[in-house]
Curated annotation (Swiss-Prot):
<dbReference type="GO" id="GO:0010345">
    <property type="term" value="P:suberin biosynthetic process"/>
</dbReference>
<comment type="function">
    <text>Catalyzes the reduction of fatty acyl-CoA to fatty alcohols. Catalyzes specifically the formation of C18:0 fatty alcohol. Provides the fatty alcohols required for synthesis of suberin in roots, seed coat and wound-induced leaf tissue. Provides the fatty alcohols required for synthesis of alkyl hydroxycinnamates in root waxes.</text>
</comment>
<keyword id="KW-0444">Lipid biosynthesis</keyword>
<dbReference type="GO" id="GO:0006629">
    <property type="term" value="P:lipid metabolic process"/>
</dbReference>
<keyword id="KW-0521">NADP</keyword>
<dbReference type="GO" id="GO:0080019">
    <property type="term" value="F:alcohol-forming very long-chain fatty acyl-CoA reductase activity"/>
</dbReference>
<keyword id="KW-0560">Oxidoreductase</keyword>
<dbReference type="GO" id="GO:0102965">
    <property type="term" value="F:alcohol-forming long-chain fatty acyl-CoA reductase activity"/>
</dbReference>
<dbReference type="Pfam" id="PF07993">
    <property type="entry name" value="NAD_binding_4"/>
</dbReference>
<dbReference type="GO" id="GO:0009651">
    <property type="term" value="P:response to salt stress"/>
</dbReference>
<dbReference type="Pfam" id="PF03015">
    <property type="entry name" value="Sterile"/>
</dbReference>
<comment type="similarity">
    <text>Belongs to the fatty acyl-CoA reductase family.</text>
</comment>
<dbReference type="InterPro" id="IPR013120">
    <property type="entry name" value="Far_NAD-bd"/>
</dbReference>
<keyword id="KW-0443">Lipid metabolism</keyword>
<dbReference type="GO" id="GO:0050062">
    <property type="term" value="F:long-chain-fatty-acyl-CoA reductase activity"/>
</dbReference>
<dbReference type="InterPro" id="IPR036291">
    <property type="entry name" value="NAD(P)-bd_dom_sf"/>
</dbReference>
<dbReference type="InterPro" id="IPR033640">
    <property type="entry name" value="FAR_C"/>
</dbReference>
Length: 496
């Protein structure tokens, strides 16, 4: 065990899958910034060949604003030299055997050199196609494990999952691995992952034999994923396939040290490499921005429920610290919840109040340049009440519009069809988000708390400063949301 993280990273060769993803970028940037003497970073990306992989890494990772601090510290020439010497682009795909690394010489070299394998690759769409979700989140995780076992120097597999693999359980969610043989739904049906794959393949075969369009196949595979997830007690395909991935890792790890990081909702950087950096709208961010744009009038949420968020740089710090602690540890199978609900909770109601104050003071502009005035949102605490509200507020008036369209088809075009599609989209999104906005669980994080305390003690003793902080108690939610996160969304996502 070594909790001097900077020293631990020195001369290490690390494979990172899903390297163009939000969390992976922050993880890679942190390593290069604090330990330029890392030996090598093999970064796996989906690409047709090495040239395409290198181009993706350059445009989607290293040219991003995230790397501006490193670029300022080193200058363009030295940074480019560092990337040339330390980073190896690897075209591949974890959904395929050997991670899709077709270059046998590269594959053999990697298996001789790699010390740490970090699996961040995932599809995070809640209603992903079942074949895609199983391919990446479930059996892709197993492919990464099998590749790691072939690495002769490997000290650890660190797998990034999600805290929401717990499903919709209320109360204190335990920080422990899944035991596949213990997984049964409320009717006693035991989960069989291989059977799930066979069911998926059979459905896909039937659809192809029927000459279904790609659109119909996609819709059918999405429906199958949601159907199987709910049958076994999970709310959606994403968390179901991620949980099965964890189960396969636990069952087949043998003696390989395994650490599973389960972050909650990942948000913008708290402090490193600079505050507020984020890519895309993530979970609760979509709601915040919709509110700022004045288009959110009502929303399904229990304002007293905790919204478990954690800044992305804290997740990266926890990953590095956990790797340093457990690398080379015999028989290790550790789970870390990285979130805030247990030690420093913030509710949806509190977030709304902060958003009201922010957008009242800093209003967005509409397309015509006028300032957007926000008002408080009508929050509806149950799905039944939300459906009733939508029926009375929108669906009944829509029936009148349908009648007008039928009687006077030349006057309105298909206004009914257009508005009905929008309402159906809203209801679909609400159904997907329901498990999270009404979530009643709190994530036990005693493992993470202990890891964080040990790391703080080690850092203060040796360096007198914190370089790998991931203590959620240090987050001031009012300051973070107002001055860092929401302003970061406006700057980096809306480009205002």
């Amino acid at each position: 065990m070594e909790l001097n993280c900077v020293q631990f990273l020195r001369n290490k060769t690390i494979l990172v899958t899903g390297a163009t993803g939000f969390l992976a970028k922050v993880f890679v940037e942190k390593i290069l910034r604090v330990q330029p003497n890392v030996k090598k970073l093999y970064l796996l990306v989906r690409a047709s060949d090495n040239e395409a992989a290198t181009k993706r890494l350059r445009t989607e990772v290293f040219e991003k604003e995230l790397f501006k601090v490193l670029r300022q510290n080193l200058g363009d020439e030295k940074l480019n030299t560092l990337l040339y010497e330390k980073v190896v682009s690897v075209p591949g795909d974890i959904a395929t055997d050997q991670l899709g690394i077709n270059d046998s010489h590269l594959r053999e070299r990697m298996q001789k050199e790699i010390d740490i394998v970090v699996n961040v690759a995932a599809t995070t769409n809640f209603d992903e196609r079942y074949d895609v979700g199983l391919g990446i989140n479930t059996f892709g995780a197993l492919n990464v494990l099998n590749f790691a076992k072939k690495c002769v120097k490997v000290q650890l597999l660190l797998h990034v999952s999600t805290a929401y693999v717990c499903g919709e359980k209320p109360g204190l969610i335990p920080e422990k691995p899944f035991i596949m043989e213990e997984i049964r739904n409320e009717n006693g049906l035991q989960l069989d992952i291989n059977l799930e794959r066979e069911l998926m393949k059979q459905r896909l075969k039937e659809l192809n034999e029927q000459d279904c369009s790609e659109e119909d196949i996609t819709l059918s595979m999405k429906e199958l994923g949601m159907e199987r997830a709910k049958l076994h007690g999970w709310p959606n395909t994403y968390v179901f396939t991620k949980s099965m991935g964890e189960m396969l890792l636990g069952k087949h790890k043998e003696n390989l040290p395994l650490v599973i990081i389960r972050p909650t909702m990942i948000t913008s950087t708290l402090s490193e490499p600079f505050p507020g950096w984020i890519e895309g709208l993530r979970t609760v961010d979509s709601v915040i921005i919709a509110y700022g744009k004045g288009v959110l009038k009502c929303f399904l949420v229990d304002v007293n429920s905790v919204c478990d968020m954690i800044p992305v740089d804290m997740v990266a710090n926890a990953m590095i610290t956990a790797a340093a602690k457990h690398a080379g540890g015999s028989g290790v199978h550790m789970v870390y919840h990285v979130g805030s609900s247990h030690q420093n909770p913030v509710t949806f109601g509190e977030i709304h109040e902060i958003a009201v104050r922010y957008f009242t003071k800093n209003p967005l502009r509409s397309r015509n340049g006028s300032l957007i005035t926000v008002s408080k949102v009508r929050f509806i605490p149950t799905m039944a009440l939300f459906s009733l509200y939508m029926t009375l507020r929108y669906k009944l008036p829509l029936q009148l519009l349908k009648l007008v369209d039928i009687i006077y088809p030349w006057r309105n075009g298909d206004k009914y069809g257009d508005k009905n599609r929008k309402i159906e989209l809203v209801m679909r999104l609400v159904e997907l988000y329901e498990p999270y906005v009404l979530f009643k669980g709190i994530f036990d994080d005693r493992n993470t708390k202990s890891l964080c305390a040990n790391q703080k003690e080690e850092e203060i003793k040796n360096t007198e400063k914190l370089m790998f902080d991931f203590d959620p108690k240090g987050i001031n939610w009012g300051d973070y949301l107002t001055n860092i996160h929401i302003s970061g969304l406006v700057t980096h996502v809306l480009k205002k």
